[in-house]
Amino acid sequence: RWLGWQKFCWISCLFSSISSGLDPGEQAKVTTALDTAQFAINAINEEYIAQAKAIEEALKVSTQARSADLLRRQTELAKFGSKVGKALKAVQAASAIASFVFTFFMPSELDVITSLINERFNEVNAKLDRIDEKLDEMEKSIKADTAFNVFLSAWIKWEYKVRNGAKKLSDIRKAMGTKTQRIDQVKLAEEYVKYYETNNLDGNVLSLYRMAALPESITQRNIFDRFIAQFGCDITKLSELMILVQNIMTSAGQQKLTYYYFKGDQSRANSSFKDIQMYFFKIRQGFDDRVWHCRRNSLDYAKRDANKILKNMRGSSRESIVRAIFNELKVKYPWYTWAVAAVKSDRPRIRGLELRGSTYFRLEDRSDAKKVKGYFVVYEDTRSSASCSDITQAKTLLVFKKCDGCNSDYIYAADNILSKKRCGESTLERLVDFKQQCPVCHRWPYSITCYCANRVKQDSQNMGLYCISSQHH
């Protein structure tokens, strides 16, 4: 409330100083323009701070993080990518400042601009510049990935034109806040109009919209489709791309509306904002559709990525291959938790330990036809839970002999996927049906054949058996 009172006093002081030069209608227009800009800027500032934090967390993702934490971060970032309202508010804020310039500085009969008006104008303008700086910080963080940066440079060729236009507009606004003569304000506005036209910036908004929302004529892909084709269905990176597209679109939209206001064409500025609004919603729809596509087809993409790693790492140690596949799938597709293991082709013949369930897939390295190397990949919904005590109820159970020379590091499993490595030596033993496996021993318990049960126990504990189970529903 104190801030609101301070703001009221500021505006009151402002217009008591200039009331002799402005009629009530002009005063109302100036008040509306500045207040609209102030309101829009304040509304989006906190959102951009939260978005920057989400990006920072996403970029610090570690393979040591829990799957649930990875999923939370990715979901939060995707939500920010889908929120175009804040971008539209940023466009409106710049539009309101341009409207203020047109309404007061440009057609005003006052030759002298009071220092108090300039001070208020600079205050609002500085807040808008700080938001632009925050957008630049987010962009630099995202584009620290070299491959990401190369992709953007190839597909957003006019990005630098937009960035240069934003710098020019910022410089013009700052200069306006230092001038006390109306004619100087007019000259600055004319300078920007000429720059905008000379550099052909008017087509940037439409070009960006077409690239992001509409399929390209030959390949029938937009920028999100091309990104998925090159980087796979990584929703974290896809969300970062959407945020970059939003930021560029926001800047281009601010420049476009400012151009029309500085030209004195308020009607065209209003219609252009409606177009920009539609463009943002269409781009968001394209992004949301691709996120849904990635979620729906995540297992297919995971299989493709795992096979690609296996192909690229032929000749590497099996332990390093298992670790690479596990880390890739864990970070890229966190709505599933994963387990990966290197195995021998033969399985133990113990009743009760038969392969069951379907939430897994098998990879094979056939580079050596005489010695096929097998890998199991098991997955589970991250939101479900499992513990060692649940193993008898497991929906998917894989029990296999470890590969020759393997040690415990040849199995990597997420926190809520069970493995013998984590659940203790008696895990598999609890699943064996000893009456079926050793029927003679159970009919004649004092017979010498009773060594069977001990042998089965030893097999399940000491022969290098591993199990991966999933509670997938």
From Swiss-Prot:
The entry's keywords: Coiled coil, Secreted, Signal
Subcellular location: Secreted
Keyword Secreted included in the entry's annotation: yes
Keyword Transmembrane tagged: no
Tissues in which the UniProt entry reports expression: Component of the acid-insoluble and acid-soluble organic matrix of the aragonitic skeleton (at protein level).
Signal peptide: 1-21
Main location: secreted
Gene Ontology cellular-component terms listed: extracellular region
Residue ranges the record marks as coiled coil: 40-60, 116-147
PANTHER family tied to this protein: PROTEIN RAPUNZEL, RICIN B-TYPE LECTIN DOMAIN-CONTAINING PROTEIN
Official protein name in the record: Cephalotoxin-like protein
Organism, as annotated: Acropora millepora (Staghorn coral)
